[in-house]
Swiss-Prot record:
Protein name as it appears in the record: ADP-L-glycero-D-manno-heptose-6-epimerase
Keyword field contains Cell membrane: no
Cofactor: NADP(+)
Disulfide bonds: none
Subunit and partners: Homopentamer.
Residues that hold substrate according to the record: 167, 178, 185, 199-202, 212, 291
Entry note about domains: Contains a large N-terminal NADP-binding domain, and a smaller C-terminal substrate-binding domain.
Residues annotated for NADP(+) binding in this entry: 10-11, 31-32, 38, 53, 74-78, 91, 142, 168, 176
EC numbers, comma separated: 5.1.3.20
Gene name of this polypeptide: hldD
């Protein structure tokens, strides 16, 4: 049996599908369906059981779980604007610690979601404490358990892997609201208004030139399954493409994919701007000095574990995502 926490969420539901594609259905899905609409993310999944997150936590504390093959822990509060540190540390740190201790006692592989938010204002995205300066309590809640793992690396009884997700986009993120990916928001904005708005240039970057390491959720699933297949590998690893691309690339991929749906030709960036399909708004004063204009994962440690699969660039991954979303309409 494999446990997937956050199973009705964005990455968790895609992991369940990834396991299903391998023929694995002995899955315990764990989540909080207070937001009942999230059930839609599990409708086409095959699972053995569903547990509410509070019941699951009690079962972990009581040792009342069946024999497990692995725990894929994706459940967390991922709202980077959440200010309630007490809630965040219990939900993101303490629950992770309890699961870790259970898995170590039972010798069960434990893969968990960390975050690139641990780097905060750093300009170097290498898994090293010198680069880790979270700017919010969300990032700190993730860093705190990464630090625990580092202190326990020499005494592990079973695999433990923390994956620092960068800017993930893809199917089944619609419930995340403002925390959904820029690709999701660009797509909905273009469909509603006929154009996409991006920040104008600032801090040495041209209009729409601020860049992120955007990674398709399909590649995130592939990385998780790689570690599931290699239980001898443990540690904290960046989970990005190793490629920074500007927001302009995301917007262009969204607009041109939707234009193709209408039988219209793809346009270069300059033409998209000229036709008013891509517009720039002044960079907000309240974000100046507090905004990451560039992120790019160093994936050397990830690649050193034997993960050799190519990762989608924005043009490929975002186009796939838009076509998937439109096929549902």
């Amino acid at each position: 049996m494999i446990v997937v926490t956050g199973a009705a969420g964005f990455i968790g539901s895609n992991l369940v599908r990834g396991l299903n594609r391998r023929g694995i259905q002995d899955i315990i899905a764990v989540d909080d369906l207070t937001d009942g609409d999230k059930f839609r993310n599990l409708v086409d999944c095959s699972i053995a059981d569903y547990l509410d997150k509070d019941e699951f936590r009690e079962r972990v504390r009581g040792g009342n779980l069946p024999a497990l093959r692995a725990v894929l822990h994706q459940g967390a509060c991922s709202d980077t604007t959440e200010r309630n540190g007490r809630y965040m540390l219990d939900n993101n740190y303490r629950v992770t610690l309890e699961l870790f201790e259970y898995c170590q006692a039972e010798r069960v592989p434990f893969l968990y979601a960390s975050s690139a938010a641990v780097y905060g204002g750093s300009s170097v995205y290498v898994e090293d404490p010198a680069n880790e300066h979270p700017l919010n309590v969300y990032g700190y809640s993730k860093l705190l358990f990464d630090q625990v793992l580092r202190t326990r690396m020499d005494s592990l009884t079973a695999q433990v892997v923390g994956l620092r997700y960068f800017n993930v986009y893809g199917p089944h993120e619609q419930h995340k609201g403002r925390m959904a990916s820029v690709a999701f928001h660009n797509m909905n904005q273009f469909l509603a208004e006929g154009h996409v708005r991006l920040f104008a240039g600032w801090d040495g970057y041209e209009d729409g030139g601020q860049s992120r390491d955007f990674i398709s959720v399909e590649d995130v699933v592939a990385v998780n399954l790689h570690f599931l297949d290699n239980p001898d590998q443990s540690g904290v690893f960046n989970c990005g493409t190793g490629r920074a691309q500007p927001f302009n690339d995301v917007a262009a991929a969204v607009v041109n994919t939707l234009r193709a749906e209408r039988g219209e030709a793809a346009l270069p960036l300059a033409e998209l701007v000229k036709k008013g399909l891509l517009r720039y708004i002044p960079f907000p004063d309240d974000l100046k000095g507090r905004y990451q204009s560039y992120t790019q994962a160093d994936v050397s440690r990830l690649r050193a574990t034997g993960f050799s699969a190519p990762m989608r660039d924005v043009q490929t991954g975002v186009s796939e995502y838009v076509r998937y979303w439109r096929a549902l309409k």
